[in-house]
Amino acid sequence: MTLKIAFFTLILLVSIERVYSSDEEYRLLKDLREGYDPVERPVADHRKPVNVKLRLILQQLVDVDERNQVITLVVWNQYTWNDYKLRWSPEEYGNITTLQIPHGTLWKPDILLFNSANEHFDASFPVHMVVSSNGDVLFAPPGIVSFSCSLSMTWFPYDQQVCYLKFGSWTYGKKLDLQIDDSDLPDGHKMDLQYYIPNGEFDLLATPAFRKSTTFLDETYVELYFHMHLKRRTMYYGLNWIVPSILISLSNILGFTMPPECGEKITLQITNFLSVMVFLAMVSEVAPPTSESIPIIAAFFSLSIVILGLSICASLIIVNIFFRHPKTHRMGDWTRYVFLEWLPWFLLMSRPEHTFCRPRREEEKNDEEAGGDGTKLLENQQHQPRPRLLVNSQLVMDSTVPYLEEIIGYLKVFKAKLDDDEEEEEEILNWRFMAMVIDRLSLFLFTGLIFGTTALIFAFCPNLFTDSPIVDIE
């Protein structure tokens, strides 16, 4: 047991000895610190600027908050510059070529992200600086940065966004020459993407960058703009938003294939109406409340809601017409011509054979003429001279004429009632057939509206089949 303790103690002492710097490194650090001031700019001639290169290493696109117009990234800001006071000859210091010096002990540029949306503005982690023997200083602080971006939601979810990160010195003007470090980077990219983790919602198409000089209070400042061209992946929204909405609209169309008197189709259409309202509410949760434009998917859902609302109104009208009665509603001549003759022909509808009744006035006139002839016939027979042998028959006839006239009257009333019933039944069938015609017309009309509006909206979407940017980044 004692031997084990001694062995681990020896290993610990060796490790501690290795952690401590050597005499050469200690002497080198002492010589470099002598006469060094971290406030002083690292230039021999104060009239010349400090050349600082910035290389933006993008690791991950964490979040795109459309509602708050904020994008969150994990980046490494790699700054490089040369400090003439930090040069040494490696042969004089045990072949030491690099040093790791804590943050805050050397001069560093006051470069910030101007459009930062972080709570503390600068979210970079203070790491050590790496100094080479030729005076080159490497400072690469990692950080989770959030920056504001004006996101255009017009073509959501088939949208493309172009956002930028604006870097620049906060106080140094012409005294700091800020450059883009794009060495060994592919065309179209000014960000280093060798450690980039692809995002599940957006594709990163390009990362151009530009250098721009601005003047503020008679001082010229250099600013770097790193753009990000993002294209949204639409499979999620297509499968979970658009396809269900289209299926709901199609099921609403199928409601017009049900019998006109069926009230369940109104229940189906109201359910579909409320379902699309839920999808529209989901869009409102994503889009910013002060959006300058309406997202295309919101327009699609809004048009679907309008079409569904109109289909509900059409179904109510169809049911109302189907149950109309001739005693309460009279069909006009133009209505009869349009909905019973012209539209059925136009919609290729065939009506089973039916018997049309003659106008009532002609029937009554014929009945009156028929009734009058019968009465006159009886009267003529009553007053016509008859042979003597038929005297008894004449007496019988005279006694039965009133009864026959009463029977004829009852027959005329019964026939008129049958004619009225037939005419009423025919009128009821006309109203029902008119409801069927409007139902068929609604089927064709709303089918065309749904497919037409869907094709029209997505046909005008400029980013559906192209990767071209929607914002000019020059």
Swiss-Prot record:
Tissue spec. comment: Expressed in pharyngeal muscle.
Family: Belongs to the ligand-gated ion channel (TC 1.A.9) family. Acetylcholine receptor (TC 1.A.9.1) subfamily.
Subunit structure: Neuronal AChR seems to be composed of two different type of subunits: alpha and beta.
Swiss-Prot/TrEMBL keywords: Cell membrane, Disulfide bond, Glycoprotein, Ion channel, Ion transport, Ligand-gated ion channel, Membrane, Postsynaptic cell membrane, Receptor, Signal, Synapse, Transmembrane, Transmembrane helix, Transport
Bilayer topology annotation: Multi-pass membrane protein
Transport listed as a keyword: yes
Claim: Membrane is one of the keywords in the record: yes
GO biological process: action potential; chemical synaptic transmission; determination of adult lifespan; larval feeding behavior; monoatomic ion transmembrane transport; multicellular organismal reproductive process; negative regulation of gene expression; nematode pharyngeal pumping
Cytoplasmic topological domain residue ranges: 324-440
Stretch list, region Disordered: 359-378
Signal peptide feature range: 1-21
Location(s), subcellular: Postsynaptic cell membrane; Cell membrane
Gene3D superfamilies for this protein: Neurotransmitter-gated ion-channel ligand-binding domain (2.70.170.10), Neurotransmitter-gated ion-channel transmembrane domain (1.20.58.390)
Transmembrane spans: 238-258, 266-286, 303-323, 441-461
A cellular component term, taken from the record's GO annotations: postsynaptic membrane
Glycosylation sites: N95
Record-given protein name: Neuronal acetylcholine receptor subunit eat-2
S-S pairs: C149-C163
Alphabetical list of CDD domains matching this protein: LGIC_ECD_nAChR, LGIC_TM_cation
